[in-house]
């Protein structure tokens, strides 16, 4: 037999082939640590409604973070720690990568939206920021989209050198900002006339800030604009996209082509060009001819991260539709439909309410879609529309309380979701300022509950026995009006008035930013 020849089965004897057949080890659960907090609330401090955070978004690089609040403001943060600070020799000595402490600092803020009133519909339009999306950077400038219920704005934030006016023709050395002379000795040196006047003529220019020198001006000097070395961040609104939605805007999403984006309300999805603010194209319209025939509304819409012709949108019936913009101008027909069929006999009054999808996110590679409804997270494979590949129970202990949640409208809360950049984990929020992180690799049992506080792992302490309800705890519940109506699966009390709706995962690192009322908490693993 020729030694150079071999049978096809010989490859199976190689070590790498044998290793490939072995079950792959599961990623170890991450230990999450507190990194930073901005706007931390003191004990007993009341939170102003306008300060509550309503949107969070990392940019594509992860070096900038934007938040929006109910007061219509956008706040920008930038990363200050160097991700490449370790030397090569230090990295070579490490057996495993060490989790670095990510640090962000306040960069700037600006008023994005103001409260308005629609006189034709007698409708108040609040200034609350619903969504923020980062756009592609250019010339060291930051670009982002922000929207409230009706109007989308395109912002440019750039550093500019501060310009000052120098070589003034008038003497400003003896004046101060409040219009009075800055030196008491100079004012006392003037001769005071019997009628209370002054021997020197004082000409009042704006706020008495400028004084003519004694004897008048001998020569005329033009002011000179001098550019200093100080830098100042200047936000500027480049475009305003308005009058295109009859219903409240719930989503905006940038296209991977860098030129277009979509905006979605309850019944329509519009396609915009970033440079054209007076024209948009309606690509999805689910409004029936008779509004009495309306059975579902659009809840969220998201572009595919790499395919500029593909987008997904979710509905209040729990379905997700994938559409291809190349099929037709008006995408009435979907390319794929993702929905989970309910078990026979399991339908109740609350089934459709809790099935409504509040948020969807594409994975970074575009292969999977993560969706959040009231009770669960679902992970979908876009190549398999028969059902989700994984379902994660977020707060199953609330299922017996659905009637109470319906009475106080908590059942309509819209929780967001996010995925890690490597696609190995997903996260979403819950009540009592808690959020949960799940491992989504096949066979993973990772399910971590974290609290938005300086001690995120506080809720991890096992509590096998249900605490006894003493007289003190009973009177506390009555006094607070039942804000803590029960306990979760671990025996910890839950508070429906404190809910963590908004969070975002860093695009390349295991770092999560989440909002608890007016406070922004950041964690890393």
UniProtKB/Swiss-Prot annotation:
InterPro entries hit by this protein: PP2A_PR55, PP2A_PR55_CS, WD40/YVTN_repeat-like_dom_sf, WD40_repeat_dom_sf, WD40_rpt
A single GO cellular-component term on record: protein phosphatase type 2A complex
Gene Ontology terms, MF aspect: protein phosphatase regulator activity
Region (Disordered): 1-30, 169-191
Biased composition (Low complexity): 171-189
Record key words, sorted: Repeat, WD repeat
Each WD repeat, start to end: 48-87, 124-165, 244-282, 293-333, 352-390, 495-525
SMART domains linked to this entry: WD40
SUPFAM superfamilies for this protein: WD40 repeat-like
Lineage top rank: taxon: Eukaryota
Membrane-spanning ranges: none
Family stated for the protein in its record: Belongs to the phosphatase 2A regulatory subunit B family.
Function statement: The B regulatory subunit may modulate substrate selectivity and catalytic activity, and may also direct the localization of the catalytic enzyme to a particular subcellular compartment.
UniProt subunit comment: PP2A consists of a common heteromeric enzyme, composed of a catalytic subunit (subunits C), a constant regulatory subunit (subunit A), and a variety of regulatory subunits such as subunits B (the R2/B/PR55/B55, R3/B''/PR72/PR130/PR59 and R5/B'/B56 families).
Protein name listed in UniProt: Serine/threonine protein phosphatase 2A 55 kDa regulatory subunit B beta isoform
Native source species: Oryza sativa subsp. japonica (Rice)
